[in-house]
Swiss-Prot record:
Compartmental location: Cytoplasm
Binding residue positions for meso-2,6-diaminopimelate: 340, 364-367, 415, 419
Annotated UDP-N-acetyl-alpha-D-muramoyl-L-alanyl-D-glutamate binding sites: 21, 117-118, 144, 150, 152
Name of the featured protein: UDP-N-acetylmuramoyl-L-alanyl-D-glutamate--2,6-diaminopimelate ligase
Motif (Meso-diaminopimelate recognition motif): 364-367
EC id: 6.3.2.13
Provenance organism: Helicobacter pylori (strain ATCC 700392 / 26695) (Campylobacter pylori)
Cellular compartments per GO CC: cytoplasm
HAMAP family noted in UniProt: MurE (MF_00208)
Modified residues (N6-carboxylysine): 184
Post-translational modification note: Carboxylation is probably crucial for Mg(2+) binding and, consequently, for the gamma-phosphate positioning of ATP.
Gene name per UniProt: murE
Domain of life: Bacteria
Length: 447
C-alpha cells in the first residue's frame, strides 16, 4: 500500500510511504520503503539499489495519533463487542471510528468495505490518520491473532485492550493451540488499561490496570441476575475496587440481543465504555436498547418458523449458538472453510450432533479443496448418520432445509454470517445466506 506522508529520513524528503517493493522501485525519490515482517523477504530488492529502508518499528516516530485506540481480541465476539462499543460511544455523542471485519466506519458512515479483520500496518496507520483528521476521540478496532504475530499493530499506544475469550481457531496458521493462546495473551503483557473475561480459563495477563467482567467468577463487572428469554435482561453490578464492597453501582439493562455469549459481549463493551468515559453505569446501560446487533451474528432472518444466520465457524462459536437454542429442535446447516484448520472439522460435526436433531452438511468456502472431502472430514465426528443430509450446493441445501422446516423447529445456518461471496478453486460467486432465505419466503408469500 502507498500512503501519502511527507517526511524526512536520512536527509531526504519523501512524499509517500509504501510496503510494496514495486511501487518504491518505480519512484524511489518520492516513495520510502517500509520494511515489515510480511515483506521482509523482498527487502533485499531495495537494499541492492542502495535505497533507504524504514523499519516498521520506527514508523511510530513519524505519526502523532491524538486519539484513544481500543483493541479487541478473542476467538469469538470481537465484531459484536467492537460494534456495541461503537454504538454506545456514538449515542454518548463521542466522535468514534470503528475498524474490523465489517469495514471501516467513522461517525456512522462507512468509509471502506470489508477487508481483513486487522489490515496491514500502513493501511491501519492511514485509517488512524483519517480518524484523527475527522477529529474522532476514539478508534475501536478488532485485533486478530494473525495481526499480533505479524506485528500489524506495531507502534500503536492502546488506551484500552479487551479480551473476549480464547478457545481454538486458525491452527493452520499457528500450528498449535498453545501458539494460538500465546499469541492472544501476548497482547495483554503490558501495564496498560485492559478489560479481561474473568471466566476465561485460558487468559494470561499482566494484572496491573486489569479490570474484569464475568458471569461465574467475582469481577469488577458482574451480573446479579439475568434472563435470556425472549432477549437479554440483567442486573449489572460494578465495583471499582473489589476490596471495598461498600462502593457499588447497580443498573438494570435490557438488550434486543440473544444468547448467553452476547451477555458476555455486552459486559465487555459496557465495562470498556465505562473505563474510557468514566460515566455512571446508569448512563451507559439504557443505550444498550439501541443496539440490535451485527448482521450475520445471531441474525434472525425469519421468525415463524425461526431461521437464524450466524458467522460461527469454530467449535466454541457453534456451541455458543446451539446453547442459545438448546430447548428447541435444532436443524443445523453448515460446512467448513477449505485451506483452513482441518483438525476442527470432526469436532464441528460432533458438537452439531450433540445439539441438533437434524444436520445438513454443505459447502462453505471450499477454496482449493474438494467440497466432498471437507464434508467427509466433518462426518467423521458424527455418530448418528441417520440425522444427516448431505447437499454440497449451499443454495440447494438451504432451500431443502426451509422446505422441510416445521413451526416448532429452528434452522441455524452457520459459518458465513454476513459474507456475500462464496470462494471456490476457480471462481468466486455472489452468495448470501440471508438473500436465499428472504427470497424463499417472499416467493412463498406471493404464492
Amino acid at each position: 500500500m502507498k500512503l501519502k506522508k511527507t517526511l524526512t529520513y536520512q536527509n531526504h524528503t519523501y512524499s509517500f510511504l509504501s510496503d510494496n517493493t514495486h511501487e518504491v522501485l518505480e519512484n524511489p525519490k518520492e516513495i520510502l520503503f517500509v520494511k515489515t515482517p510480511l515483506n521482509e523477504k523482498y527487502s533485499h530488492l531495495i537494499a541492492e539499489k542502495n535505497l533507504a529502508i524504514l523499519d516498521f518499528n520506527e514508523l511510530k516516530n513519524y505519526f502523532d495519533f491524538k486519539i484513544k485506540i481500543v483493541g479487541i481480541t478473542g476467538t469469538n465476539g470481537k465484531t459484536t463487542t467492537a460494534s456495541l462499543m461503537y454504538s454506545l460511544l456514538l449515542d454518548l455523542n463521542k466522535k468514534t471510528a470503528l475498524l474490523g471485519t465489517r469495514g471501516f466506519f467513522i461517525n456512522n458512515e462507512r468509509i471502506k468495505e470489508k477487508g481483513l479483520t486487522t489490515p496491514t500496518l500502513l493501511e491501519l496507520y492511514s485509517d488512524l490518520e483519517e480518524a484523527v483528521r475527522l477529529k474522532c476521540e476514539y478508534f475501536i478496532m478488532e485485533v486478530s491473532s494473525h495481526a499480533i504475530v505479524q506485528k500489524r499493530i506495531a507502534g500503536l499506544d492502546f488506551a484500552l485492550k479487551i479480551l473476549t475469550n480464547i478457545t481454538s481457531d486458525h491452527l493452520d496458521f499457528h500450528q498449535s493451540i498453545e501458539n494460538y493462546r500465546d499469541a492472544k495473551n501476548s497482547f495483554f503483557k503490558d501495564e496498560g488499561l485492559k478489560v479481561i473475561n474473568r471466566d476465561e480459563t485460558n487468559a494470561l495477563f499482566n494484572p496491573v490496570n486489569a479490570h474484569t467482567y464475568a458471569l461465574d467468577k467475582k469481577a469488577h463487572l458482574n451480573v446479579q441476575a439475568f434472563s435470556l428469554n425472549p432477549s437479554i435482561s440483567a442486573s449489572l453490578c460494578y465495583q471499582q475496587d473489589l476490596r471495598d464492597p461498600n462502593f457499588k453501582e447497580i443498573a438494570l439493562m435490557h438488550s434486543p440481543l440473544l444468547g448467553r455469549y452476547n451477555l458476555y459481549n455486552i459486559l465487555a463493551g459496557v465495562l470498556g465504555v465505562k473505563l474510557l468515559t468514566q460515566l455512571p453505569l446508569e448512563t451507559i446501560v439504557p443505550l444498550l436498547e439501541n443496539f440490535y446487533g451485527v448482521k450475520g451474528r445471531l441474525e434472525i432472518v425469519h421468525s415463524k418458523p425461526l431461521v437464524v444466520v450466524d458467522f460461527a465457524h469454530t467449535i466454541d462459536g457453534m456451541q455458543q449458538v446451539f446453547e442459545s437454542f438448546k430447548n428447541q429442535k435444532i436443524t443445523a446447516l453448515f460446512g467448513a472453510g477449505g485451506d483452513r484448520d482441518k483438525t476442527k472439522r470432526p469436532e464441528m460435526g460432533a458438537i452439531a450432533s450433540y445439539y441438533a436433531h437434524k444436520i445438513i452438511l454443505t459447502s462453505d468456502n471450499p477454496r482449493s479443496e474438494n467440497e466432498e472431502d471437507i464434508i467427509k472430514d466433518i462426518l467423521k465426528g458424527i455418530n448418528d448418520s441417520s440425522k444427516v443430509i448431505v447437499e454440497k450446493d449451499r443454495k440447494k441445501a438451504i432451500l431443502n432445509a426451509l422446505e422441510n422446516l416445521k413451526d416448532d423447529e429452528v434452522l441455524l445456518i452457520l459459518g458465513k454470517g454476513d459474507e456475500n461471496i462464496q470462494i471456490f478453486k476457480d471462481k468466486t460467486i455472489f452468495f448470501s445466506d440471508q438473500e436465499v432465505v428472504k427470497s424463499y419466503y417472499q416467493h412463498l408469500k406471493q404464492g
